């Protein structure tokens, strides 16, 4: 998608709004009003778009600005996800409580996964520079808890020649742990986490079906 663009609110009906935003795309994430309320385009009508707001629209009025962010609504996948408690747009509730108490302020934007924590990364022993890797290849592991081993995989849609792989050590989520050159020559920097559009199904090699019910 293109970079961010600006528009304005035409109509408001609860969490559903009509906005004027030329060039909007279905599924695009938007920020609404001065509070930057989170929303998503759910339909297009010419240069207008219908959006759903994921926070209260109380106090908004026609004419207020809307920004299309140029990318779909996404989530972050990586170490820390399995230990976290999040709201519906993957905002970490524990961090929000520490900042704002029990009530979630509208328009509050916090990284879903902690950018200040270091994670113990163990690279896959079988991988060496020059190896051909593809989506789903295990780059290494992070021992997220005593019982949970988080496998760091090559994200979907990326594959090619492994240029280098980070040695064992503690890394921030934003640190580059591997570089991959795809067949077109583009170099991709892979981190301990990646973002994924919420409306796009995750690919899988096979699906294992349960044979026993979970008794609670």
Model-derived features: where do they sit?
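P-loop NTPase nucleotide-binding/switch module
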Residues: 98-123, 127-156, 172-216
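Conserved "cap/hinge" positions at secondary-structure junctions
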Residues: 21, 34, 69-70, 89, ...
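Short, compositionally biased
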Residues: 43-49, 79-90, 148-169, 187-204
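N-terminal accessory targeting/assembly segments
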Residues: 1-105
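Generic structural hydrophobic/aromatic packing signal, biased to beta-strands
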Residues: 19, 30, 41, 51, ...
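Residue "hotspots" at secondary-structure boundaries inside conserved domains
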Residues: 22, 58, 73, 125, ...
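Short alpha-helix capping/helix-loop boundary micro-motifs
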Residues: 15-19, 49-55, 117-128, 161-166
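Compositionally biased, intrinsically disordered low-complexity regions
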Residues: 9, 16, 142, 161-162, ...
């Amino acid at each position: 998608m293109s970079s961010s663009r600006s528009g304005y609110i035409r109509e408001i009906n609860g969490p559903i709004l009509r906005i004027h935003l030329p060039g909007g795309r279905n599924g695009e994430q938007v920020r609404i009003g001065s509070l930057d309320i989170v929303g998503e385009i759910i339909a297009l009508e010419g240069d207008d778009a219908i959006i759903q707001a994921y926070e209260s629209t109380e106090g908004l009025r026609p004419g207020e600005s809307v920004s299309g962010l140029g990318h779909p609504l996404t989530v972050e996948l990586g170490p820390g996800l399995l230990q976290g408690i999040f709201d519906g747009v993957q905002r970490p509730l524990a961090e929000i409580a520490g900042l704002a108490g029990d009530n979630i302020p509208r328009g509050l934007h916090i990284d879903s996964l902690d950018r200040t924590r270091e994670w113990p990364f163990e690279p896959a022993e079988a991988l060496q520079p020059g190896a051909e890797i593809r989506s789903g290849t295990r780059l290494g592991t992070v021992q997220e808890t005593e019982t949970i081993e988080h496998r760091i995989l090559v994200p979907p849609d990326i594959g090619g020649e492994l240029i280098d792989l980070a040695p064992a050590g503690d890394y921030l989520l934003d640190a580059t742990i591997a570089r991959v050159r795809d067949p077109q020559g583009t170099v991709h920097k892979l981190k301990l986490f990646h973002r994924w559009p919420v409306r796009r199904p995750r690919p899988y090699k096979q699906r294992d079906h349960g044979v026993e019910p979970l008794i609670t």
